[in-house]
Amino acid sequence: MSRNETLFERAQRTIPGGVNSPVRAFRSVGGTPRFIERAQGPYFWDADGQRYIDYIGSWGPMILGHVHPEVLEAVQRVLGNGFSFGAPTESEVEIAEEICKLVPSIEQVRMVSSGTEATMSALRLARGFTNRSRIVKFEGCYHGHADSLLVKAGSGLLTFGNPTSAGVPADIAKHTTVLEYNNVAELEEAFKAFGNEIASVIVEPVAGNMNLVRATPEFLQALRRLCTEHGSVLIFDEVMCGFRVALGGAQEVYGITPDLTCLGKVIGGGMPAAAFGGRRDIMAHLAPLGGVYQAGTLSGNPIAVAAGLKTLQLIQAPGFYDTLATRTARLVQGLANVAREAKVPFAADSLGGMFGLYFTDSIPTSFAEVTKSDVPRFNAFFHKMLDAGVYFAPSAYEAGFVSIVHDDAIVDATIDAARGAFASLAA
């Protein structure tokens, strides 16, 4: 047995499924998950010493690559001061100021420790602000594992939601309405039917958990207009795409201003940190100012804040996002070209440092289109690339990520490996 296999067998005795987050178990693609021992730059190494070009980047945070020397120095500098205080720090103020500067829609911000906490808290705040209960989300958009958000639509637009996870009470699910992503007509119908009941609409402006799917400008414009007309709070979940697709996030790309924004991943620099923020009049309803309670023992943890603040400073370097976008586009265009050479149905898309690979004839715009992907062929491709030392997301329904240290040589090596993988799929 390989060391990865031994560790996986051992892990399953004490950890449900052997992992602490389901996608890591390789259930979607089959085989043994890789247990990572260390990482550096664009690479990581597994328990058997195999090196991989890393295209998940800890599912988004590692925009600078692993163990960036300046981030490492920032963390080491504060370690000797204490790990956690449970009291305010100057660094919390500094990162809040930086976030508000970079994302103009955020007038005030509250730090938390995970994306799930950010979305859960933002929804509670929206409900407290509006005194309404109903929330609207979109099929295929993942907003963390809070009960209200683990809901899928029923058979018709106006039916109550049904939970898609065991353990979610129907009484909670019924307050969530799920609509089709990018469907403006369905959105308008929903607001016409019960717009004055909607506390909030939460959306990923660039979805990453049904692979990469972009919102259309018309869809986001309709969301902004309808939320304004009906007094509903528009929440952009930019936990994944915030600081990934542009310095100001997807809201900068689209020119749409949400009421609240959820952030995570990049703002922790690889440490557990997330945030939610937005309009001052809405944020004023949070305790201790208002009646909406939210708290966290490790919120604003000084070590996580040090890593996050240094990361936010470094990504402001001139040309950073142009370089990141160019390299990501080089990757997806190269993959599409070699797939075409092999006559394998395949499409790819990218925005900033995010990308999507689809074993379909065209780039999808909704969850229904994503599900048409040739999953067995993706799984075969994944393992061919893994054997060649390239680690893509172990699921046909996850976006990938490029860091600033994925240079042209690394991208070209990936494309060369893919040429052989696609050729074998065509055989």
Swiss-Prot record:
Record field: catalytic activity: (S)-4-amino-5-oxopentanoate = 5-aminolevulinate
Pathway: Porphyrin-containing compound metabolism; protoporphyrin-IX biosynthesis; 5-aminolevulinate from L-glutamyl-tRNA(Glu): step 2/2
EC supergroup of this enzyme: isomerase
Residues that bear N6-(pyridoxal phosphate)lysine: 265
UniProt entry tagged with the keyword Isomerase: yes
Alphabetical list of CDD domains matching this protein: OAT_like
Xref: InterPro entries: 4pyrrol_synth_GluAld_NH2Trfase, Aminotrans_3, Aminotrans_3_PPA_site, PyrdxlP-dep_Trfase, PyrdxlP-dep_Trfase_major, PyrdxlP-dep_Trfase_small
Name of the protein in its database record: Glutamate-1-semialdehyde 2,1-aminomutase
Superkingdom field: Bacteria
Primary localisation category: cytoplasm
Names of required cofactors: pyridoxal 5'-phosphate
GO biological process: protoporphyrinogen IX biosynthetic process
Family, similarity comment: Belongs to the class-III pyridoxal-phosphate-dependent aminotransferase family. HemL subfamily.
